Amino acid sequence: MNKWNFIESHVEQGIQALAGKNRIPELEIQTGHDVLKRHQKKLFPSAVVFGAPIKPSDCGRYNSPGGKIGVLYAADSSLTAAAEAYGRMLHLYGQINYPAGVLGQHFMCSIDVVRTVKVIDVMALCESLHIPLDSLENEDYTFTQWLMEYLYTHFGNEYDGIAYTSRHKRYKRCYAFWERPGLKAAFEDTPGGMTPYASYRETDRGMFPEWWKKTTMTGEEMFEELLNFRIIYLPE
């Protein structure tokens, strides 16, 4: 059985055919307070960071090498944002035990959406083009990085980025945003929204296990109960 192979011209033709019929799958994110979440490994001046790595080794799944596009990664859920960050750490270093001090060093950040944001749903896009969805999630970033650059180049004035499903946690969505020329900034830091995991409290009960009886979950509980990591308290 023949497998799908990434051929740029074939994907381009498919995308342009959908665009010609106004069938590019899209989603809207409405304005609001504390709409998006983002993990940061230390306290930065802002969570709204459009990173543009140059070296291929520094590029994420949707970063085009060479620093061509600044990309802001975020998620609908703190759980998904954390799963993306710590799932990569597990794959890179096999780390499942974290010293309790990490809870005070790593941050969950909240982002406000200050204008309506429109993104391309790349999962639905690939479904429409009969591109296997594992092409968006495997260890080879060639296709996803090309796709991001292509969509930005051809649709960057119409959309603010892309939406996709986390391969680490199938809960809500992840986003890779670009800066849209000619429009005001879409995102701002939620006032007081940079919180170390040590003092973070989650209220989204949709992510809690059925047996969870409390109405909130601490950052430490998220690590252990939802992400299956262990927090180790070292002797002082």
What positions do the PLM features span?
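Active-site and NAD+-binding cores of ADP-ribose-processing enzymes
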Residues: 2-60, 91-236
